[in-house]
Amino acid sequence: GDALTYWLESYAKENRVDYAALKKRLNNHVIQHIGAMPLDKCELRHWLACFDQVAKRTPVTAGFLLQTCKQALKFCRRRRYAISNVLDDMSVADVGKKPDISERVLSTKELGELLQALDKKIFSPYYIALIRLLIVFGCRTVELRLSEISEWDFTEMLWTVPKEHSKTKVAIFRPIPEAILPFITQLVEQNRHTGLLLGEVKQEASVSQYGRLAHRRLNHPHWSLHDIRRTFTTMLNDLGVDPHVVEQLTGHQMPGMQRVYNHSRYLDAKRNALDMWTERLGILAGTHENVTTLPVARRK
């Protein structure tokens, strides 16, 4: 128990965006069962009893717990805080299973139906906002779940995800497309008193669960909220957006030396890409006027 707590407080708290969920999982499934035992008395069978109990219901979670505990013990060992090698030879397959890697991308028809469903308000207000912004920005769910109103700069038309909310621990800069501005300003006005863009922080598990079932309301084959992000990447690539720009928008760290040349933050290219994307979304949702409109003056 001490070893896991040490890792949680000395490492995970600063370096893992999912710290709160991790702490809860480890407490529920491991620490409360074997936490009172000294680490050197904790044999493989004791650990396995915890993982096996979880695997009966959710084998993927059991595998995740094993990987987390191995990481924690390795951290403690490197720091000479406590030494235990009992989990070294164990793999995910020994206690549970790896998550299925989804390759799901929504079709243009499905994405259009989802956008129309958002307009018809068939989801609750929190999820209408969350899903719409996931579609527009291709961001991670956590970046919106934790988003504070102070991150949104309407003078520069820029959303800055602070490194504390970013999985890669690097700040992410996203231009705010004109087309979504009225929706975001309405959210800000409505939720200003909370300081949070979405008005409250819902737990990751609740949001994931809602997202896993959302497709049913549209009679779609299964998709999850993360599949919206994959759809964003795929469709922007199909629109001919430079892969570097797509990587920047999704907040993936650039490989190797490319990070060094990254200080311009590609803002103009990102703005153009998101303007083109929101125009495409307007067409898919059936809200785009198929008439010649005066171009919106680009904000410098």
Segments predicted by a language model, with ranges:
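Short, polar N-cap/turn motifs at the start of nucleic acid-interacting alpha helices
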Residues: S84, E151-L158, P221-H222, V241-N262, ...
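Short, aromatic/basic-rich helix-turn unit that serves as a nucleic-acid recognition element
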Residues: G1-N27
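A Lys/Arg-rich helix-loop hairpin that forms a DNA/phosphate-binding surface
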Residues: G1, V17-A20, I31-F51, G199-E200, ...
